[in-house]
Amino acid sequence: MRSTRSIALATLPAAAAIALWNGYRRVSKELGSHVAASPLIPGKVRSIPTSWGRLSYRIVPGTDPGPPLVLVHGWGRSADSVWWPLIANTQRTVVAIDLPGHGRSLLDQRFTFDLAADAVLAAVADSGVIRPVLVGHSMGGPVALTALRRIAQAGESDFAGFVAIATSSYWVRPRHQIMVAAAPYAMAQGSPILMRAQRAETRRAPDQASRIAWEYAVRPPRRILEEAAAELRRFDARRWDDLSLPPAVWVITLDDGIIDPADQVASAQNLGIPTVDLPNDHPVVIQAPAALARIIEEASSVWSLNRPIRIRRRMLRPNGADQNP
């Protein structure tokens, strides 16, 4: 009797492993039935050779004479996969940047926020936009703050304003540390956790299955996720004494499961930035793009009063510098 029970207990780990593997295969097969397809996004993709690889960004000319928008995406995403809903809901000129190692931007060295900030400023200079509004979502907030700090250190003022969305000026709390340390493994391509998240999202919106598959397919490799997560774990702008901000607004996502709304509010208060609340979760750009566009446009219209907003005449480009979307 004891022998039979011992054998049964010994087989439990193997049975559990087989069950997990079969579950993984079922989820993989279900997700594999959806063909990844991006939404139609206007504008052109431009690329710049750099010392660290290649910088790519999308520029969308707008009809609204207000300040252009420079959009900086968050961790594990790309310009197109985050910002396409906002682009569809604004008539402003938009520059949406793929950070190094993300989207179409290539990176042959370690990812850092300083390098990402340089990429943002390089895209602004190459695009020809004058006094744009800098918009950062999630990790894009720290990258944008780093870019603004670099400008302040140089004694320059190139932005009409700054909009922080669902982000924090510090990521050093224990909860942040644990979450960010685990994220590169939990959210890398092929991760069972990521696959189950995609399946749940697809089942909630089956008519958007192809678009959802595309958003998950364009995530960066694990190396970039790990290096970006390491930068986040070190980031704390609360003690920066050389940061000079343009007019700004901080969008608080009240139902955020990634960045505690209390940390968002504390970040804004620490930097002296007024806040606007939205009753959304972390992916607010997907959930409420029209409301977000309205907040950005109303704030930046006030900031731009009596300010010349225009686009410089671009220098002639070699053939092939602009790409189709």
Please give the residue ranges for each predicted region:
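Conserved alpha/beta-hydrolase catalytic His-Asp/Glu region
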Residues: P174-R175, Q189-L243
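Conserved HGGG/HGGXW glycine-rich cap/lid loop of the alpha/beta-hydrolase fold
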Residues: R58-R104
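Catalytic active-site module of serine/aspartate enzymes centered on a nucleophile-bearing elbow/loop
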Residues: I273-P325
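Hydrophobic alpha-helical topogenic segments used for membrane insertion/localization
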Residues: R2-R26
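Gly/Ala-rich beta-loop-alpha elbow adjacent to hydrolase catalytic centers
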Residues: G136, G140, A144
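Active-site loop/oxyanion-hole signature of alpha/beta-hydrolase fold enzymes
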Residues: V95-V133
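Conserved serine/cysteine hydrolase catalytic core
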Residues: A229-A266, P279
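Flexible "cap/lid" loop of the alpha/beta hydrolase fold
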Residues: T146-R149, Q153-Q189
